[in-house]
Amino acid sequence: MDLLNALVALTNFVIVPGLAYGSQLALGALGVTLIYGILRFSNFAHGDTMAFGAMVTILFTWLFQSVGLSAGPLPTALLALPFGILGTIALALVTDRTVYRFYRQQKAKPVIFVMVSLGVMFMMNGIVRFIIGPGDQRFTDGERFVISARTFKKLTGLQEGLAIKTTEALTVITAVIVVAVLFWFLNKTRTGKSMRAYSDNEDLALLSGINPERVVMYTWMIVAALATIAGVLYGLDKSFKPFTYFQLLLPIFASAIVGGLGNPIGAIAGGFIIAFSEVTITYAWKKVLNYSLPDSLAPDGLVQLLSTDYKFAVSFAILIVVLLFKPTGLFKGKAV
Amino acid sequence: MSDNPYQDDHGNKDASITNVKGIGTMQPAHLKSGPTHKVEGGPFLIGDTMTGGYGKGPDILHDCTIAVDKGEIAVIVGPNGAGKSTAMKAVFGMLNVRSGAVRLDGEDITQLTPQDRVVKGMGFVPQTSNIFTSMTVEENLEMGAFIRTDDFRDTMEQVYDLFPILRDKRNQPAGELSGGQRQQVAVGRALMTKPKVLMLDEPTAGVSPIVMDELFDRIIEVARTGLPILMVEQNAKQALEIADKGYVLVQGRNAYTGTGKELLADPEVRKSFLGG
Amino acid sequence: MTETMKHTLLFVFVGVMILLEGMTDFLFFSGSWNSALVILNMGLISAIMAIGVNIQWGFAGLFNVGIMGFTALGGLAVVLVSTPVIPAAWSSGGVSIVMALVMGALTVVAAVMITKFMPAGKLRALVLAVVLIAGFFVYRAIFDPAVGSVEAINPALQGNIGGLGLPVLLAWPAGGLLAAGAAWLIGKTALGLRSDYLAIATLGIAEIIIAVLKNEDWLSRGVKNVVGLPRPLPYEVDLQSDPSFVERAASWGIDPVTASTVYVKAGYALMFTVVLLALLWMAQMALKSPWGRMMRAIRDNETAAEAMGKDVTRRHLQIFVLGSAICGIAGAMMTTLDSQMTPGTYNPLRFTFLIWVMVIVGGSGNNFGAVLGGMLIWFFWIKVEPMGILLMELVTSGMAEGSALKAHLLESASHMRLFTMGLILLLVLRFSPRGLIPEK
């Protein structure tokens, strides 16, 4: 029995990756939940917006790398991120002007917006593939580890190593900052409050002199920024592939719904719930159990509850269970 | 099926993709404001011989006139379906007024959108969904003052003085308050714009008699500050008792008009609308 | 021009396009009857899927984004019905697998019973947890070794439990049944919730179904694919070695290879047309029947229908199951056409969202619209690529030879496909929101 090593193994294989993935999902889910709360539909193009943001960032990263600009130990992508955000904001605003605004003027039903977002999804997907191709792109550079397994072992003398990738640390730190800024904005600024008011009661917001078009514009800007950050962090941590981003829709939707659609706190909680369930259920617990149980009880198999290919199934099962018991999600939906 | 193909949702009610909570349902008569022009004389606010209906629908109001002057409380009463709320909505620009006019403070505002009427000084409290339930009481008041660019802390203090309970509950979500308190938030929100006239659509709907009396007291208190109040009321008797002016509507027409006392004393009105 | 004429012309347009594909190699056409028939066959299958989705969306407003899953279940049915029986697999572990699955199902049923009949509280949560965890481990204990032994049998070719060795045409209704069963389970859960969460449920289930097909090698060999599935029509090589066929082909003046491929594809086209017409007829009849009128009444005013004592959830479940069954049939037909089951190729863009484009473009609520949309969009889906290349050649014709931009543009032309589908969808939603053939 060796609880310390068990704890390190657990941290290394479950907690750290879970935190990073959870942060990425939370940022994605925040974007979905804001659109749901304020524009009142589920944006199927969100995954592709993330892909677009990541793509613009990657192009700028390559540009910076080619002229020798770097952020030292941090990934160059961080320098490119603001440009990625600006590009995505521009795309979101142009899309809103040319596509969505018409339906607002028509007072179209939310489900029509959902269909429109399908069209936007196809187009964005096409644009991204057209520009950068459907293949895998790696754009991570700089220091690979904050602490590598070998250094950790040397430092502590433990048998198990703990590796924290720079991208993982960066993901969590960025997510914390972004979420803090977002909540400050929504709860403390006049514009943020007007967005919440519009989400709460559109008619009354109008009567209070809040301009819906401005609210919508700010929403798209924030959502574009969130999507880009989430997309870039995910790409840095794993890799960038347009199709993967499209497939992220399911866990992102699941996170937003589990937390309660329209509720930003719920989106964050949902992101971590989904991420940790996926990681824990598809992780092979043999190592951790070997350390924490007496030898006589040590398991023979891998003690993996489900193969990693079933991670979607996990998100979905959690979703159903939550909805069965709390139909509006864990944090009552709708309180942007 | 809806006539507008963009509003045809095939009866879809999927909560995982669409969000209809708090969605806008207002159908203003004008989407863009038209011109206004100065007029001389007349009461402070008047909906003058208004005839009209919703959208392209049939006329609901017929030559209906509603007016209120400074320092007055004017009350619209009448049987169910008489067009009481409709008359007030017409004044607020939610009804297509085909003939007649709405004038406020020496200006013809018939062509304005509801939002622009708020800017011109109309404070409107809808009958339902009249607060931001997920926001705190104080945030509700702040949103009421959204169009103001000056310092509105004084106004907020005045609202708190008028409705002391709101001061205690300022940091509580408005949705958690009782029915009477919610109505106070709603009125307070409308007062935050410093309106020139306050319009209340059935402020006592669904509250207990005790709360109703208290609400009426507050409304009188607001009126004493010189703010004209136009109000639609279901509880005709109590409303007429505090009214300077009363309008009894029947089927979208003015049936009886007079001071509150006159109407209460009118045997015809008593027999038909006040239960003897 | 009357409406009917306009709609007929639209169908004629699609027909002419497919004919041109066979006749001429002008512009983006290939001039190959083979290719024309390939487009026609998948177009017919797409039309059937579109009918299935149209029934759900057009008649009941149900937003199903899991079409891919039902299609894949149809494909699975082909494997399970038509591949030869593998006795060794059944004797070594097949029975245990079935037992394990029954155990798993029983566990779920028990869990549902517990939540239904036990009073809420800590005790219920505890019992529920114990039942679920114990059930899971028992299931895995029976399941894992059985799967191991099944997968060990002749893994290069089989390694799965095989099928029933029945005629492949039986797989089509079986595919429908399999999809219907899955749809019933999903609908029961997602439509029964206090608010309706069908969209996310179908989105998730479809991914799960694909994950199961990809990973459960004992079932359909996973990503190793099942190839050489039995066909309802003769093989081309057999036809080519059949003297009477060769002779007949010669009398038409066609070489035997072309003749045989065209013969087989035309045979499929005929079969698919029969199924399409039958389903279309049934869907039209259902729509005009009292049942269809009730469905539309529910759609147009659910509250009123509920007040009249209609069980809206039950009706929605019915129509969801029916529509999904149709998608399952189409999926089975598709796998039969390909004569292989390749779980790795199922992609929601192609199998779910493209069908939605077909339904919306064709005209939601109109079965003929769905058929038109299915055929038309499928034609574009195939032909946008050569069109894009043509366009890019035109655009880049002025550019310097060997420039990087030119190379990139030409290379990326094939990705125009998704972009164009989105554009078509947006244009139709904007300028003809009821679709090309609107609901009457």
Task: Kindly give the residue locations of the regions a language model identified.
Chain A
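Inter-helical junctions in multi-pass inner-membrane proteins, predominant
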Residues: N5-Q24, F185-R190, V216-G262, V279-L289, ...
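Single transmembrane alpha-helix segments in multi-pass membrane proteins
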Residues: L10-F60, V94, T98-I112, D203, ...
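Transmembrane helix-bundle core of multi-pass membrane transporters
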Residues: F102-Y103, V111-K188, V215, Y283-F312, ...
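Hydrophobic alpha-helical transmembrane segments of polytopic membrane proteins
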Residues: T88-A90, L250-I274, S315-F325, L330
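Helix-loop-helix "hairpin" substructures at the membrane interface of multi-pass membrane proteins
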Residues: Y21, E160-F240, Y245, P264-G270
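Membrane-interfacial amphipathic/re-entrant helices at transmembrane-helix boundaries
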Residues: M1-G28, V56, V67-L79, Q106-V111, ...
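Alpha-helical transmembrane segments within multi-pass membrane transporters and channels
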Residues: G68-V120, A269-I273, E278, L323-P327
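Membrane-embedded helix boundary and interhelical linker motif in transport proteins
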Residues: V16, L39, A45-V94, L158-G161, ...
